[in-house]
Design a protein with these regions (language model features):
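Hydrophobic alpha-helical transmembrane segments of multi-pass integral membrane proteins
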Residues: 1-393
């Protein structure tokens, strides 16, 4: 079975509707990666002056779709799979899952079609309530109420999305900014919590006599400080103490990811990509803390969080989950090593270089390497995601 279970871009495509919609990670991870490519291609064309009729203003579409399109698809796929593991309950699957996926897809395509703006808003806003319904029932049946935190996060995402649409519809002007930044903070907080759960766990399972050890005081402080920092960013983002809070959070995150470090993880791409993504979140808040002194654009720290933090963590988690949950060994396909490095190049071009060198070709380079990274994921993982498990039959 090892020979057939080893995944590569040359693997046979054995499409099965029942397999594709058996668990949430399969369709959502696949579409998230496809959309990551499409999203960045459209944005690169927009930056070059090739515009498209859109329900959203151009820059708002870019930020909204990164968070409520791409990242939401990844989080949905993760939760619709992980909640089943945590609770032992059967999760949304089959036609019900297909309908939820179709709703997400409609939210991505309707903004470009000649339909009433209210229809676009209603369709896009319907997604999170249905996702909440899908994950709440098994959590309540299981009784482990600590997992209800993810229901709360989904509710906050729904609220932030509502603010964006109320602004676009001119019902509540000037609220889109709050909705986008609020949603980004929620996403980062979700990543901090999930990363804090799984990164040390994955590392300990993969590395014999793992040397990483959590620091108790850091573990107790990091999430409360993160919540305070994010709430303050919605209230007084330009106050001096806001930069101080970002600096404190960056320090705690650096200590946290440093406490997990074992140099042997550098030889395991499925581990270093997750540690690296967490480190990029720390870097993002460090850059945020230094903005007044470095005289940098706020977009520098935002893209450290999105391209670096969200990009690396989502690509790393999708790559790992899609192996383990399709019955394959946790051995990263060789081409995905290249995908991870492409994402690092995209990060360097968009964050580190553009901080000091404002050259249009660097935007193109960043977009190209982002698209290459997620395009390689699609080409490599589509056989696994649309086919029955490799260890069945």
């Amino acid at each position: 079975m090892a020979s057939t279970s080893q995944l590569s871009y040359r693997s046979n495509l054995n499409f099965s509707y029942s397999a594709l919609f058996s668990l949430g990670f399969r369709p959502f991870f696949l579409l998230a990666a496809v959309f990551a490519v499409v999203l960045m291609l459209i944005w690169a064309l927009e930056l070059r002056g090739i515009t498209f009729a859109n329900y959203y203003p151009s820059i708002l579409w870019h930020s909204h779709e990164l968070i409520f399109g791409f990242t939401t698809a990844v989080i949905s796929g993760f939760l619709l799979t992980a909640v089943g593991n945590w609770t032992g309950k059967v999760m949304l699957h089959g036609h019900g899952l297909a309908a939820l996926v179709l709703l997400w897809f409609a939210g991505r395509t309707l903004p470009f079609l000649p339909v009433e703006p209210l229809v676009v808003a209603v369709v896009d806003l319907a997604f999170y309530p249905l996702l909440i319904a899908a994950i709440t029932k098994p959590i309540l049946q299981n009784g482990k109420m600590k997992n209800m935190v993810f229901v709360i996060f989904c509710g906050l995402m729904a609220l932030m999305n509502l603010l964006v649409h109320l602004d676009v519809l001119n019902i509540a002007p000037n609220m889109a900014h709050l909705g986008i930044y609020g949603a980004l903070n929620v996403v980062v907080l979700v990543m901090l919590i999930i990363g804090g759960r799984v990164i040390p766990f994955f590392s300990e399972r993969a590395i014999p006599d793992y040397k990483g050890r959590s620091i108790t005081v850091v573990e107790k402080l990091v999430l409360p400080v993160a919540v305070i920092t994010f709430l303050n960013d919605l209230w007084q983002p330009l106050a001096l103490w806001a930069y101080g809070l970002s600096g404190l959070l960056a320090l705690l995150l650096l200590l946290r990811v440093g406490s997990w470090f074992d140099r042997r993880l550098l030889s395991n791409p499925l581990l270093w990509v997750l540690h690296g993504g967490y480190l990029m979140i720390a870097l993002g808040f460090l850059l945020r803390a230094l903005l007044p002194w470095l005289q940098l654009s706020p977009f520098i720290y935002i893209h450290a969080l999105t391209v670096g933090g969200i990009g690396l963590l989502t690509l790393g988690m999708m790559s790992r989950v899609a192996l383990g949950h399709t019955g394959r060994p946790l051995k990263l396909p060789q081409v995905m090593h290249l995908a991870f490095y492409c994402l690092l190049v995209a990060l360097v071009c968009r964050v580190l270089v553009l901080a000091w060198i404002q050259k249009p070709f660097l935007y193109d380079m960043s977009a190209m390497f982002w698209m290459l990274a997620f395009g390689l994921f699609v080409l490599t993982y589509i056989p696994a995601l649309v086919s029955p498990r490799a260890d069945k039959g």
